[in-house]
């Protein structure tokens, strides 16, 4: 999709197909990854099963002492969020879509139990269908129409190292599910993130996502992050 759109609208999404490597450190996880690989191959997805020796050879940055193996998906990748957003917007406009920026939804209009439109910046816009694609704000917007959406954001932590000499720009995204961590190359540095089991609910004082938090950040909490670096 992204490659086709890049050509269609002549704008780069910053797409890099470095692949993704998922590793296993116990038998249960290894069996799970093997099942995933088998299922993916049934749908003609390119998945390669690697033993620990292959992982050590191809990705010496990984300590393989406790690794049983992994699966590599060369078709996975990452893109620049701003590039993707602009590319999708440009493609949508070419197909006749209109985009209104800085236009928060004041109200979802309904009649006889059916959604009929939205009120934006004081202006009512009639529509046959509404697609709610507002991420972590979806729950609050759904409430305006009496809809309960079971969605709530959690704080997400990551760190970025200092520049690492000879760090490969083609390093895949490495996922270590057993340690709830992931790693990827980021402009010559290594980004390390976590998806912890006991995550911290965001905005737990008000239980509401601020309208102006699009580019906001949470305070540092290294005590919460540090156990995953051991």
Annotate each PLM feature.
Residues 1-58, 180-183, 187-191, 216:
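Dinucleotide-binding Rossmann-like beta1-alpha1 core, especially the glycine-rich loop
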Residues 46, 98, 148:
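Residue-level detector of anion-binding/catalytic polar loops
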Residues 23, 105-108, 174, 182-183:
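A structural signal for short hydrophobic beta-strand segments in well-ordered beta-sheet cores
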Residues 20-24, 70-72, 158:
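Short aromatic/hydrophobic contact patches that present stacked aromatics
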Residues 163-230:
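Active-site lid/adjacent beta-loop-alpha segment flanking the redox-cofactor pocket in flavoenzymes
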Residues 70-129, 133, 137:
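Helical element adjacent to the flavin cofactor pocket in flavoenzyme catalytic cores
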Residues 2, 30-33, 52, 84-85, ...:
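A general structural signal for well-ordered alpha-helical segments in protein cores
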């Amino acid at each position: 999709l992204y490659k086709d759109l890049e050509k269609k609208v002549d704008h780069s999404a910053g797409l890099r197909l470095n692949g993704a490597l998922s590793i296993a450190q116990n038998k249960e996880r290894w069996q799970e990854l093997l099942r995933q690989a088998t299922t993916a191959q049934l749908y003609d997805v390119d998945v390669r099963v690697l033993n620990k020796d292959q992982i050590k050879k191809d990705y010496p940055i990984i300590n393989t002492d406790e690794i049983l193996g992994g699966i590599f998906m060369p078709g996975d990748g990452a893109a620049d969020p701003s590039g993707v957003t602009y590319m999708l917007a440009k493609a949508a406009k070419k197909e006749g879509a209109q985009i209104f920026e800085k236009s928060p939804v004041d109200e979802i209009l309904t009649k006889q139990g059916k959604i009929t439109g939205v009120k934006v910046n004081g202006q009512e816009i009639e529509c046959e269908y509404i697609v709610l694609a507002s991420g972590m704000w979806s729950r609050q917007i759904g409430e305006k129409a009496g809809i309960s959406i079971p969605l709530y954001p959690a704080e997400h932590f990551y760190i970025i190292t200092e520049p690492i000499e000879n760090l490969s720009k083609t390093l895949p995204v490495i996922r270590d599910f057993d340690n709830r961590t992931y790693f990827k190359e980021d402009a010559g540095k290594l980004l390390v993130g976590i998806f912890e089991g006991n995550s911290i609910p965001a905005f737990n004082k008000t239980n509401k996502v601020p309208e102006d938090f699009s580019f906001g950040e949470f305070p540092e909490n290294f005590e919460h992050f540090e156990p995953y670096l051991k």
